[in-house]
Regions:
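Soluble extramembrane domains flanking the early transmembrane region of eukaryotic membrane proteins
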Residues: 2-273, 563, 569-586, 590-625
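Terminal single-pass membrane anchor helices
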Residues: 80-87, 283-299, 319-320, 427-431, ...
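Interhelical loop segments of eukaryotic multi-pass membrane proteins
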Residues: 109-132, 296-303, 316-322, 346-354, ...
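Juxtamembrane/interfacial segments around transmembrane helices
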Residues: 150, 328, 449-457, 472-485, ...
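Hydrophobic alpha-helical transmembrane segments corresponding to the first two to three helices
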Residues: 251-384, 391-399, 405-408
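Multi-pass membrane glycosyltransferase architecture that uses lipid-linked
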Residues: 283-284, 302-311, 466-498
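Generic detector of multi-pass transmembrane helix bundles and their immediately adjacent loops
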Residues: 342-485
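Extended, intrinsically disordered cytoplasmic tails
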Residues: 485, 489-625
Length: 625
């Protein structure tokens, strides 16, 4: 009887006092209605207990680092100061010093460079900024017939400055023809070998300077470039981590770099600025104990500005107007991120744990061009995924990791009874993205800043993994907006491809069976088939050795180059001398129209066809896409 009573006590103690039933046995006079009420009361007790036991789960984040910091940390943290005002004052002073040191380094890095050279720049001169992929000579026929549109650069001498990271990490993103070779996903440097160290003028100047040892790939630098006249060939070589391409044929212009140059203030201080801010952010969190909200906004502001001034500037020198123009809308994005995912999670993580939970992943995201620049994914286009080595594998690995993390976060949010609120917005987002894929002549571009925004709500669970993801995704947003602005999610396909080849573009077709040496091996005949894309294609442009030399009627179906070894002329065009002897001749064709009495190219150029003079044979065309 006693054990039965104890059992009843345990069971009934789970319910409120108002619902408890008498512990003594019922009298025989009790009615059946009372029995029914007692059973109903017990059922209500069980139901109430189950409901309480299965209430919404709340994660408890256990601190990874000790709750009580070391003695030296306790004695130096302003948290131990007697008033909140003292702590706020110390934080304000530290932030002010942090800002002033950054401004001094930024000024030194961008505004104090000078260069001098005895013969051309005897007095210190401020150099001209160049991007890593700038060149004098434009792609294909960008310099016009016989290169006349670029002739003003002859004998030009220029003092220039290159930024950091102009080595193998940057280069071509679309195919570029150099003689009989098609280069892509590599630096564009033609020549530089041999005694003269001359480069073809379509070479990227800064990467050529790295190849020549004039500037540093890591720190940048200054130099003096001098344009020269025609060169009869360019030797390829490998130096300073860059492999240059050889070109065994004449070209109308070339350039070289002068020696005996004196420079000051030309090194890019990007690493010093980054290390300073990494150290200051850690000190600020460890020693000054900011509130969660202050912690978030300091990270938001510092991470945004570190990109245009140090890690990945969008213009040279940094464009303050562009950076400030994007800063205000970026702050609205940060306000949304704080309210949607950061606030609840950050408040559950201790100040010491925030260093490794947030700061490390956040810096990894802010410096994505440095930490993940080796991943072969610049544009998620079908061409890049098919042609670029390792691109498809890298995308597969990233998609797998993303899917695992999304599933984990969805499970965490489901346990917190918050996943249902996100299901409808994400379903609507998926429908919108699918519809955008079908917009004609446009491509869906999910930039990495959009990935950071889209995935942030899934990282709002109260776990340390969520904190890691929040820091990394915030860094992604900052890197994307500060470098590329708020780029559109929908872009024209031609803009995405840039100067690449459009699929389905109609190009002329060589007729090599009808081509070759004629008239006693003195003249060279180049033939093509007469088919064209439409009636507009009334002309054919002929590039010889990567220079547009002739524009002739398509109906002729051939071009005869008289005495081509000594004087490259045609009966159909004005003379265009090329006084040199060579063993290989490279040809490419494109369709032109004659609109408004001016020739306009209406197709891409074919791949190169090589004619070997020694054995009178043809090779090609080499595919370019």
């Amino acid at each position: 009887m006693a054990s039965s009573t104890d059992s009843l006590v345990d069971e009934h103690s789970l319910s409120p006092i108002s619902h408890r039933t008498p512990l003594l046995p019922r009298h025989a006079s009790d009615s059946d209605d009372e029995v029914y009420c007692s059973q109903t009361s017990r059922a209500h007790q069980v139901k109430s207990y189950i409901k309480q036991a299965t209430a919404s789960l709340r994660w408890t984040v256990q601190p990874f680092l000790p709750t009580n910091p070391p003695h030296w940390l306790q004695t130096t943290r302003p948290l131990s100061l007697p008033t909140v005002n003292h702590r706020s004052t110390s934080q304000a002073v530290f932030l002010g010093i942090w800002l002033l040191v950054n401004l001094a380094l930024i000024r030194q890095s961008w505004s104090l460079s000078n260069i001098s050279e005895p013969s051309h720049f005897p007095q210190p001169t401020k150099p001209e900024w160049l991007h890593c992929v700038e060149s004098y000579w434009l792609k294909d026929d960008g310099c016009g017939l016989n290169g006349k549109d670029c002739s003003s650069y002859r004998n030009v001498t220029m003092a220039f400055r290159c930024p950091s990271h102009c080595g193998t990490s940057t280069g071509l993103l679309n195919p570029r023809v150099v003689g009989g070779e098609v280069a892509n996903y590599q630096p564009l440097v033609v020549g530089g070998g041999g005694q003269g160290k001359r480069y073809r003028p379509d070479s990227f100047i800064c990467q050529s300077a790295v190849h020549a040892g004039i500037v540093s790939a890591r720190w940048g630098g200054c130099g003096v470039l001098k344009m020269l006249d025609e060169t009869h060939g360019f030797s390829g070589s490998e130096a300073n981590g860059i492999r240059s391409i050889g070109f065994p044929a004449p070209f109308p212009m070339s350039f070289t770099f002068l020696d005996n140059v004196h420079t000051s203030g030309c090194n890019d201080l990007w690493l010093t600025i980054i290390l300073l801010n990494v150290a200051c952010s850690a000190i600020f969190v460890l020693l000054l104990g900011p509130s969660p909200q202050m912690f978030f906004w300091v990270l938001s502001i510092v991470g945004y500005w570190i990109v245009p001034v140090a890690s990945e500037p969008s213009s040279l020198p940094p464009s303050w107007s562009k950076a400030t123009g994007n800063f205000l809308p970026f702050l609205f994005v940060c306000y949304w991120l704080w309210n949607v995912c950061w606030r609840d999670t950050l408040e559950t993580i201790s100040s010491l744990d925030r260093v490794w939970v947030y700061l490390g992943p956040w810096w990894f995201g802010v410096l994505m061009n440095l930490t993940a620049g080796w991943v072969p994914l610049d544009r998620l286009t079908p061409h890049d995924l098919q042609q670029r080595p390792g691109a498809f594998l890298a995308l597969s690995i990233l998609m797998t990791i993303t899917a695992i993390l999304v599933y984990h976060q969805a499970c965490c949010l489901r346990k917190e009874k918050r996943f249902e609120k996100l299901a409808v917005p994400y379903a609507f987002l998926a429908i919108v993205l699918i519809l955008l894929c079908f917009v004609p002549e446009h491509s869906l571009r999910i930039h990495h800043y959009l990935i950071g925004i889209f995935l942030s709500p899934l990282a709002s669970a109260k776990t340390k993994i969520s904190g890691v993801l929040q820091g990394f995704l915030l860094g992604m947003v900052q890197n994307g907006v500060a470098r590329w602005s708020f780029a559109s999610i929908l872009e024209q396909t031609s803009e995405v491809i840039g100067d690449g080849y459009l699929s389905g573009d109609s190009m002329p077709e060589f007729d090599l069976e009808q081509s070759g040496l004629i008239n006693g091996l003195k003249d060279l005949k180049v033939s093509w088939k007469s088919e064209g894309p439409d009636d507009r294609a009334s002309l054919v442009g002929v590039m010889v050795n990567d220079v547009l030399r002739f524009i002739v009627p398509k109906i002729n179906q051939s071009l005869i180059i008289h005495n081509f070894l000594n004087n490259l002329t045609s009966i159909s065009t004005s003379p265009s001398p090329l006084q040199a002897a060579f063993n290989q001749v490279f040809f490419r064709l494109a369709f032109f129209d004659n609109k408004m009495n001016a020739e306009h190219r209406i197709s891409e150029y074919t791949g190169p066809v090589t004619f070997f003079v020694n054995n009178q044979t043809w090779l090609g065309p080499t595919p370019v896409y």
